[in-house]
Amino acid sequence: MTVAIGRSDSERGWFDVLDDWLKRDRFVFLGWSGLLLLPCAYLAVGAWFTGTTFVTSWYTHGLASSYLEGCNFLTAAVSTPANSMGHSILFVWGPEAQGDFTRWCQIGGLWTFTALHGALGLIGFTLRQFEIARLIGLRPYNAIAFSGPIAVFVSVFLLYPLGQAGWFFAPSFGVAAIFRFLLFFQGFHNWTLNPFHMMGVAGVLGAALLCAIHGATVENTLFEDGDGSNTFPAFNPTQAEETYSMVTANRFWSQIFGVAFSNKRWLHFFMLFVPVTGLWMSAIGVVGLGVNLRAYDFVSQEIRAAEDPEFETFYTKNLLLNEGIRAWMAVQDQPHENFVFSEEVLPRGNAL
C-alpha cells in the first residue's frame, strides 16, 4: 500500500502555487529572496548611475559631482544629504521635497534612496544564498561569509551617521568621495590607531595572503594526469580522485614553517574565519566611532610632548597631522558653518 503525504491539488492555495513558481528551476534562480534582491539592487544601481550622471552636489556640499558638470568616474559621486536634513529619510513626498523631484535630488534624496535600497539588496543577496543552499542541501556558510561585507556597509553608511548629527557625515557614493571620508575618519577619530581597525586590516590582508598561499600551493601540487602542455584540461568536475596532493602540500609547508594544516576542513574553515572576523571587527569599530568612542589615546606622551619641544613620537606627530585635517577639512567640508580659524590655532610642530 502506498501512503501519499501532503496536500492534494484541490487543497493548494495561491501561496503554494507562487512558492512553486518562484522556486522553479530556471537559468537565473528567482526565489522568495529575489523579490527583495532584484528590485532593490536595480533601484540602488539605477539611482547611483542617475546621480553620478546628472545630479549636482552644489546644494549639499558646494561641489560638482556629476558627469554633466565635468567630473569623471573617479570624481563623480552621489553625495550625502545636506547637514540641515539631519536623519530624515527624505521621501519624495515628504515635507522636505513636497513632491518636487528636482528639489528632492538637490537636497540629497538620491543618497538615502541608494543607501537604503543598497542595504536591502545586500541582505536579499545573503538570503538568496541561504535559500538556494537550503533547497540543494548545502550548509549556509556562503551566506555567513557574506555577512561580513553587509556588516561593513550597514555600519559605515547607516549606523555611523545615525550616531552623528545626520546623514551628511556618511560617505558619499563615489571613489574620491570615499577617499575624503577616509581622511575624515583619520582626522576626527584617529581611526588607524583603533584596535578594531587593526583587526580589520589583519583580517583582510591576512585573507589575501591565505588566498595567495592556498592557490599557489594547490597549483604547485596538481597531479600531472594529462597529455597537454598544462594540467588544466585534465580536470573533470565529476572525477572521484583528488586533483592535487594534500600530502605533498603538507610536507612542503611543514618544512617551511615547521607546522602545516593536515586537515582540509580546518584549513578552509580558517580561510573563512580570518576575513569574516576581520570585517566584523571593523564594523564594530565603526559603530563605536558613531558614538564617538575613543581608543588608544596615549595622554602621557601628549603631555610630555607639550612640555618638552625635543620630545616627539610617531604618535604625537600623527596627532598634529590629525589636527591639521580637522582644521582644514572642516572649512572645506562644511562651508555652511562659515568656520574661520585664525593662524594661531592651526597645528604647528615638527610633523608639519
From Swiss-Prot:
Chlorophyll a ChlzD2 binds at H117. One of its GO terms (biological process) is photosynthetic electron transport in photosystem II. Pheophytin a binds at Q129, N142. The keyword Protease does not apply. GO terms for cellular component: chloroplast thylakoid membrane; cyanelle thylakoid membrane; photosystem II. InterPro entries: D1/D2, Photo_II_D1/D2_sf, Photo_RC_L/M, Photo_RC_L/M_CS, PSII_PsbD/D2. The chain crosses the membrane at residues 40-60, 124-140, 152-165, 207-227, 278-294. A plastoquinone binds at H214, F261. The D1/D2 heterodimer binds P680, chlorophylls that are the primary electron donor of PSII, and subsequent electron acceptors. It shares a non-heme iron and each subunit binds pheophytin, quinone, additional chlorophylls, carotenoids and lipids. There is also a Cl(-1) ion associated with D1 and D2, which is required for oxygen evolution. The PSII complex binds additional chlorophylls, carotenoids and specific lipids. It is a multi-pass membrane protein. PSII is composed of 1 copy each of membrane proteins PsbA, PsbB, PsbC, PsbD, PsbE, PsbF, PsbH, PsbI, PsbJ, PsbK, PsbL, PsbM, PsbT, PsbX, PsbY, PsbZ, Psb30/Ycf12, at least 3 peripheral proteins of the oxygen-evolving complex and a large number of cofactors. It forms dimeric complexes. Photosystem II (PSII) is a light-driven water:plastoquinone oxidoreductase that uses light energy to abstract electrons from H(2)O, generating O(2) and a proton gradient subsequently used for ATP formation. It consists of a core antenna complex that captures photons, and an electron transfer chain that converts photonic excitation into a charge separation. The D1/D2 (PsbA/PsbD) reaction center heterodimer binds P680, the primary electron donor of PSII as well as several subsequent electron acceptors. D2 is needed for assembly of a stable PSII complex. 2 of the reaction center chlorophylls (ChlD1 and ChlD2) are entirely coordinated by water. This is Photosystem II D2 protein. The gene is psbD.
